[in-house]
Amino acid sequence: MLKSNYTPDLVQRVILFLLLFVSVSCETLDPYYKTQENLDLSIQAFNFEFESKAMNISARFVHPAHRANYKAQSLEMTQRITFFEATILDIKFFKIGVPVVTTSKGPEKGFNRAIVTIRYQLAILPSTKLVTRLVEQEWVLEGEQWMVIPDLSTLLE
């Protein structure tokens, strides 16, 4: 009789690995996790472009109803503000206007709005003094794309 080179312990480990792999793979295909990931990526990309003063590029993340106003204020932003540091302090999630429960796994499913609180260290010309501003960015889910509704006035005060 032929004897297998694989020990029962090794076979159990391989099966356990495959089960874990399939479990994790299924989670990444879940639209809920995709929504969360898309929000995170949109926040990072917009703020990187915004802080780099690439206003025309960052405008792709601005809600269409607010894009014209954003572009109108962009010249003043690029001329007067120098960013030194930005830190995301908090993200609150909402589903149809109602706050959702957030656990260690993240917010509950179905959220379609988020409020991101960011602390900026910046200088606003003509002053060269470093100031701190707390800004709330409102993000809304439009179809499958997250869009920001920016309020630049808090930065220009």
Region annotations inferred by a language model:
Residues D40, M55-T103, F111:
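Short solvent-exposed beta->alpha transition segments
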Residues V24, N56, W146:
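Glycine-centered loop/turn positions within well-structured domains
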Residues A45-K53, F61-A65, R80, E142-Q145:
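Structured segments of extracytoplasmic/periplasmic soluble domains
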Residues S25-S52:
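Short, low-complexity N-terminal intrinsically disordered segments enriched in polar/charged residues
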Residues M1-L10:
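N-terminal secretory signal peptides that target proteins for export/translocation
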Residues V98-E157:
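Exposed beta-sheet edge and beta->alpha loop/turn motif
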Residues R13-S23:
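Bacterial N-terminal signal peptides
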